[in-house]
Amino acid sequence: MTSTEVRVTQVKTQRQLRQFVTFPWRIYRGDRNWVPPLISRRLAFFDRSQSPFFQEGNAAPFLALRDDELVGTIAPAINFRDNEQLGRKLGVFGFFECVEDYGVACALFDAACGWLRERGMTLIRGPYNFGNSDDPGFLIGGEDCPPVMLEAHTKPYYAAFAERYGMCKFVEDYAYRIDRRPVANDAELIPERVVRVAEYAQKRAGVTVRQAHLDHWDDEIPIARRLFNTALTHLTDFIPLSEEQFRHMALEMKPLLDPELVYFAEVNGEPVAFSLALPDLNRVLIHGNGGRYPWDWMRMWWASRHIDVISFKIMVMLPEYHGRGLDAILYVNTAKAALRRGYRWMDMSLVAEENTQVRLLVEKMGGRIFKRYRVYEMAV
């Protein structure tokens, strides 16, 4: 099939948007490793009156049709705030799904590139569901198990289609898994050398570690935001999160938080590092069928009582404390809490391929790569 036999149209109506949002059910039918997103949340994501993204950007969901049959979706997007701050003309694409037909993929990529080009963009990058932490990358390894939260499960041919279209690798990220092995004493599960590093660092630097106060989460949010933004300023494409952005993210996350999995490290009473791990919501969503029917919510409620996986998502520290072992301190505290809480295994992701320091520590903790994701880019 050639791309000329495929008609691509921009979503204009609520009916079309619902078709866009529910199309993945066709692509992943029978795939036990796919985690259906909540339909209500996906619809709200594209609601310009609700979604925070549209306060600083624009996006256009597209449908690919062949003989009036829906065969693919894509959504190019532009974050004007980020582009202005970084002096770039970058667009992203996300929500890419298609049948196993390169002609369909080509038509979708053509539509996304064309939409971005018309708006003055010179580069396309993705897949991202608009944000760098929203299902980034095509899965290129690890299709044999479900993803953890904020990560994607995609068809193996997607990456091949992107490369055939002319896209090149921009970055590769790894998801690590640390399993709880059967041992006589749980303390044996945390490598002794990592514990020694953490204990020595804690004494030498005078570090105290405290759990986050979830009863006063509103007071913790600005502290976490300051640490997050300051710690990541060295990254080339990093844009500090505004107070509104970070607050929205933190409040949305609050119902999922376990106080024993959120830590601040302090020196002389001043916060210098922050870490956060979450019970993996995907262990719930995988049973929910997108929340289409009342019984889907009952199944999710039941599954929520038996989450046995945590996902370590954030570990940041002030630049002047790099190399002092604070990462080991926070990792060890989280691992001990996970063991106390009875979690079966811990995900640590995503870790960039070039982030050798974090990868080394995770591997010392017993982590092994169980998923690989690749983000692509090309000139438009």
Model-predicted segments: where are they?
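TRNA-binding/sensing appendages of the translation machinery
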Residues: 2-44, 113
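Flexible loop/turn segments at secondary-structure boundaries
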Residues: 17, 80-83, 132-134, 183-185, ...
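Acyltransferase donor/substrate-recognition loop-hinge adjacent to the catalytic core
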Residues: 3-6, 152-237
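Short beta-strand segments
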Residues: 125, 177, 264-266, 276, ...
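A conserved beta-strand-loop-helix scaffold within acyl/acetyltransferase catalytic domains
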Residues: 24-66, 74-84, 211-316
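Acyl-donor binding region in acyl/amide transferases
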Residues: 83-167, 288-364
